[in-house]
A protein has these predicted regions:
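Acidic, proline/glycine-rich low-complexity IDRs
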Residues: 1-31, 45-49, 54-150
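A structural motif
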Residues: 39-43
Length: 150
């Protein structure tokens, strides 16, 4: 890593940590590299809510809006629960489901800010195809590559 790249990353981590301190969390987008789907995830939410959220397969603008919406929705509740369908999160009346994430390997910025020992539960927001069928349910038209289940 060059000195310029190191300086950029150091500054980015500093700004991210400062924003988390001011607002409680950030949403970190990870763009597609052409071989994997984009995803966005919260960092810092575990300090107030006890968990983090992630959404795969949608661009950062959409995922950012959905994740912020869910943070507000869960603020005064027990939080996500597995396989519960939630209304009013996506446009056109589509529901989302929540599922626990099995591996935390994709959340490197979280580890960079909070350390390797920080392992809060991550909940994935799963969205359906245009017929309302969720992956991995039979008949879902969304491929594993299009919306990886973490």
């Amino acid at each position: 890593m060059s000195a310029d790249q190191f300086d950029f990353m150091t500054e980015y981590l500093y700004r991210a940590a400062r924003t988390i301190g001011e607002h409680g969390y950030i949403v970190q987008p990870v763009v597609s590299d052409g071989h994997s789907a984009p995803y966005s995830y919260t960092i810092g939410l575990h300090q107030s809510h006890g968990y983090e959220l992630v959404m795969t397969g949608l661009g950062p603008e959409v995922a950012n809006g959905v994740l912020h919406n869910l943070v507000e929705r869960f603020k005064d509740s027990a939080g996500p629960a597995p396989d519960v369908s939630l209304d009013g999160v996506l446009a056109d009346g589509f529901q989302v489901r929540m599922r626990r994430v099995g591996s935390l390997k994709d959340f490197s910025l979280h580890r960079a800010i909070f350390g390797d020992d920080s392992r809060p539960p991550y909940w994935q927001v799963v969205w359906p195809d245009t017929a309302g069928v969720f992956p991995p349910d039979p008949g879902c038209s969304i491929s594993v590559e299009g919306q990886p289940l973490l």
